[in-house]
A protein has these predicted regions:
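Acidic, mature catalytic/reactive cores of soluble proteins
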Residues: 1-754
Length: 754
């Protein structure tokens, strides 16, 4: 190979060699230097290093960071470097596990996972819940838009791997017993992986076949396993059970682990399932997948078909909900147990594509039903619910509204334009809205009870319980005490229900009959007083970061992108013109609250710098390359109307305002594909930007629209604001053929918003 080669040419040459292992390694290669830290650097998943030189002081390409933040940034990066979209997808799925999750950290050299340290009380392992679906889905959509056929080519191509993370999710029976303690660390497997890594390098952290080679599967299998893992925790009418010891995007909801149910992930699954249905719509015959995956898929399909029947006959209740969840959970455990024992798969077998499509249809029915059940009476949507497992019943209770839930519902694709507009109207008038900043908190602010108002046993409950009365009479403070005001309180040492159980068992023998009689009632009183189930974690007890009264700017910008997506979906589907205009108005309402529109005194910081959050008691805090930057890179391209469909570029600037255009002549400086700084003189009533390092100039005109491509061989003009696939691919590949693009836009094609 030459010292420099086009990436597409490299992939082509590797394909011609016909070695699947080499194809895997080449596909996931990303020639970038990038270090990504997010949040508290003391957390192991946030460790990073920006390494530019090797030990011999030679330049190297290297990157590392936590999984979520790497991939959320790469979504925006690939919009400007689209030839690497499929490589990012490969990097993503090659590092996901056999049980459908992802390690917490990713580097050019491979993957990392947190190692359990029994002597460290802060050491904690597990899997975050939402990353596997929505971040992958956004990348899949980009591939489909920029390269319409590439995903189809990969569906049956065995060039993808599984990460071999030494975590073991417990049996479903164990999860039902204690959903907060569900993941164990397999020390023996971890030691074995270390031995293999010593001889094979980074590939030693992947699942291997019997010959010692990396076990490789196709894209259909990888996409299916990610979905099946979520469906294995489906609660009809509730969401996805958070039972892998970690929360989701908002890790300040850490106490929701175990009893929490995510509507957020369910909404993203809806988008994922709809996309997979489109992707497989033209596929016929059989596809080869691992035998254990085939069995899991077929069992899940049958169970979801039963669920569809319950939904159709309006028979979903606490008992039938339990039956469906139990069946799905046991199927997932049967699969996990088998692949854990084998440390991999036994063989491959053919599965009819129609079976997968049937599964997707069944799943969509269950998902749509559950989303509908989680629409509140005011038109907003629940984000997280609470689960109670009692014998053979699953009961679902609700929390307060959260901004995250509205973003997920809008992003799901399940809502039509009038429903979206109604939800946004309600959101702006809800307790989530902070008028002083014209934007949204993560959840409504609320007044927490003072310390002395906590842990009070209502007198009617204390007086009616014979055991409590006996303990107080005997002046036994093991379980309850009376304070100076006569209020009955639980002993401060009873930090959880397990400790309460221990202390009840340790009471004197003469009280044990009363303990047996009143045990259930005591636990009910304990939960009534503390309501542990509804405690969300740091989000319910702190006042900065993701705490009470706090604006988290990344989620605000996620809302902005979701509203923009709904706007373009409405235009694509020829929705009512008034609904489309209302969506545009809502978009700019959300946008108006973002920092760059504010003065330094309003924002509490320099307005064009990204900040993590704004607490109620101060200005913007914690500057840095937050996820907000990624979302607003994407929304800005959307405002400019750059829409990629079927490999073509459609310029549709209907969200762009006239005020964006220069009123005077200006000079525009940009860096071209040869890394040379260039100047472009702009006329009044124009604006300029670059995409794939090609300058694009918009000009306001009073006549008809037009588009001009200035190429090496001359000019190409068109009355349609469309760049065909041939020239679009030239732009995406940065091949230098297109030197500049000029777009003439009549005022009536721009937004009417001032």
């Amino acid at each position: 190979l030459a010292n420099t080669i086009s990436y597409n040419e490299l992939l082509k040459q590797v394909d011609e060699i016909g070695c699947p292992q080499l194809q895997r390694l080449t596909m996931e290669y990303l020639p970038i230097t990038f270090g990504r830290r997010h949040g508290d650097p003391s957390r192991p998943w946030n460790q990073f290093e920006i390494k530019l030189l090797d030990d011999e002081k030679q330049k190297i390409l290297s990157y590392q960071g936590n999984w979520r933040d790497i991939f959320q940034n790469w979504e925006a990066l690939t919009f400007s470097y689209p030839e690497f979209i499929e490589s990012v997808i490969a990097k993503f799925v090659n590092a996901s596990t056999v049980d459908g999750y992802n390690p917490y950290r990713i580097t050019k050299q491979g993957i990392d996972w947190e190692v359990e340290e029994p002597d460290d009380p802060w050491s904690y392992i597990g899997y975050w819940g939402d990353h596997q679906i929505i971040y992958l889905q956004k990348l899949l959509e980009l591939s489909h838009q920029f390269h319409p056929n590439k995903l189809t080519e990969l569906l049956r191509k065995d060039v993808f791997s599984y990460a071999n993370v030494p975590y073991r999710i417990k049996s479903f029976a164990d999860i039902k017993q204690n959903a907060k303690s569900t993941v164990t660390y397999d020390n023996a497997l971890a030691d074995k992986i270390d031995e293999v890594v010593a001889s094979k390098g980074a590939d030693g952290k992947l699942i291997l076949d019997q010959s010692g080679q990396v076990y490789q599967v196709n894209l259909i299998e990888k996409l299916s396993v990610a979905l099946l893992a979520k469906l294995g925790n489906l609660i009809l009418g509730g969401g996805i059970w958070l039972n892998t010891q970690r929360p989701e995007w908002n890790d300040a909801n850490n106490a929701l682990v175990g009893q929490g149910v995510s509507v957020v992930t369910l909404c993203y699954m809806r988008r994922y399932v709809e996309f997979m249905l489109q992707l497989l719509s033209n596929e016929k015959g059989q596809v080869s997948v691992s035998s254990e995956v085939a069995q899991w898929l077929q069992g899940t399909r049958a169970t979801l078909a039963n669920a569809e029947g319950l939904i159709a006959s309006d028979e979903v209740n606490d008992e039938s909900r339990f039956q469906i969840t139990n069946q799905l959970g046991e199927l997932a455990w049967s699969y996990r147990d088998t692949v854990y024992q084998q440390t991999g798969f036994s063989a491959k077998e053919g599965v009819e594509v129609n079976e997968i499509i049937d599964l997707l249809h069944n799943a969509k029915v269950a998902i749509d039903y559950t989303i509908a059940q989680n629409q509140r009476q005011d038109g907003l949507y629940h984000a997280y619910n609470l689960l109670s497992l009692n014998d053979d019943r699953l009961e679902v209770d609700y929390l307060y509204p959260m901004l995250e839930g509205q973003v997920a519902a809008l992003s799901s694709g399940a809502l039509d334009a009038p429903t979206v507009n109604n939800a946004l109207d309600v959101l702006f008038s809800s307790d989530v809205f902070r008028p002083d900043q014209h934007t949204f908190m993560l959840y409504p602010d609320r007044q927490l009870p003072s310390f002395l108002n906590k842990n009070k046993v209502p007198s009617e409950l204390a007086n009616s319980n014979e055991l409590i009365a006996a303990l107080l009479q005997q002046d036994n403070h093991t379980i309850v005490v009376k304070d100076a005001n006569g209020d009955c309180r639980f002993n401060g040492k009873l930090t959880n229900a397990d400790r309460l159980q221990e202390e009840l068992a340790a009471l004197p023998a003469e009280l044990q009959m009363a303990v047996e009689r009143d045990r259930g009632e005591i636990f009910k009183i304990y939960e009534t007083v503390f309501n542990h189930k509804a405690f969300t974690g740091r989000s319910g007890g702190m006042f900065g970061f993701e705490g009470l009264g706090s604006i988290y700017w990344h989620m605000v910008s996620k809302l902005l992108l979701a509203v923009q997506e709904c706007y373009f979906n409405a235009t694509d589907n020829n929705a009512d013109a008034d609904d489309i205009q209302r969506l545009a108005n809502h978009y700019y309402q959300v946008r108006q609250g973002i920092g760059f529109n504010k003065t330094p005194s309003e924002y509490g910081a320099f307005p064009v710098d990204p900040y993590s959050h704004t607490p109620k008691h101060s200005g913007a805090q914690q500057p840095g390359m937050t996820g907000q930057v990624k979302e607003e890179v994407l929304t800005r391209f959307g405002e400019l109307g750059l829409r990629v469909r079927h490999g073509q570029i459609k310029v549709q600037p209907s969200l762009l305002r006239v005020r964006e255009f220069n009123t005077d002549a200006k000079s525009f400086t940009y860096l071209n594909i040869n890394n040379e700084w260039q100047n472009l003189e702009l006329e009044p009533n124009s604006l300029a930007f670059t995409w794939c390092q090609v300058p694009i100039v918009y000009r306001l005109v009073e006549t008809k629209p037009g588009l001009t491509l200035n190429t090496k061989s001359g000019q190409m003009t068109s009355d349609a604001l469309l760049i065909d696939s041939e020239m679009a691919q030239s732009l995406f590949k940065r091949d230098g053929i297109i030197e500049s693009i000029y777009v003439d836009i009549p005022r009536d094609q721009l937004s009417s918003i001032k």
